[in-house]
Swiss-Prot record:
<dbReference type="GO" id="GO:0005829">
    <property type="term" value="C:cytosol"/>
</dbReference>
<dbReference type="GO" id="GO:0006412">
    <property type="term" value="P:translation"/>
</dbReference>
<dbReference type="InterPro" id="IPR003728">
    <property type="entry name" value="Ribosome_maturation_RimP"/>
</dbReference>
<comment type="similarity">
    <text>Belongs to the RimP family.</text>
</comment>
<comment type="function">
    <text>Required for maturation of 30S ribosomal subunits.</text>
</comment>
<keyword id="KW-0963">Cytoplasm</keyword>
<dbReference type="GO" id="GO:0000028">
    <property type="term" value="P:ribosomal small subunit assembly"/>
</dbReference>
<keyword id="KW-0690">Ribosome biogenesis</keyword>
<protein>
    <recommendedName>
        <fullName>Ribosome maturation factor RimP</fullName>
    </recommendedName>
</protein>
<dbReference type="InterPro" id="IPR035956">
    <property type="entry name" value="RimP_N_sf"/>
</dbReference>
<dbReference type="Pfam" id="PF17384">
    <property type="entry name" value="DUF150_C"/>
</dbReference>
<dbReference type="InterPro" id="IPR028989">
    <property type="entry name" value="RimP_N"/>
</dbReference>
<dbReference type="Pfam" id="PF02576">
    <property type="entry name" value="RimP_N"/>
</dbReference>
<dbReference type="InterPro" id="IPR036847">
    <property type="entry name" value="RimP_C_sf"/>
</dbReference>
<dbReference type="InterPro" id="IPR028998">
    <property type="entry name" value="RimP_C"/>
</dbReference>
Amino acid sequence: MATLEQNLQEMLQDAVEDLGCELWGIECQRMGRFMTVRLFIDKDGGVTVDDCADVSRQVSAILDVEDPIADKYNLEVSSPGLDRPLFTLPQFERYIGQDIAVHLRIPVMERRKWQGKLERIEKDMITLIVDDQEQILVFGNIQKANVVAKF
């Protein structure tokens, strides 16, 4: 069964692309009786406030018609930022050689949180270098991941 995020991704992908942006990912977070739906958009040259406003208007219109969310919700549209979340294996591939942070659904070696250099991706496995040791993690076990911004 598809998750709400997957359903929204499929429903909104084309509309966001028609506005010249990439739908980087979607997060849905329940806060009490309300839900926050976060859309992350990206494009070459960076995302502007106008891009976010245009996507927000278009997406709001689609959600009003399709009504896929049963509860009241707030819609947020933004760029992924420097510490961008990673949602798909192709997104992980873009950041090979960089530091990422990963939060797992099921602990590996009694740890849910890992941070290290993304070394490689093979099929559905990612390899991090953590304290000079390779740590192989199953993509399907990753709950959240993001690029670690370096300043």
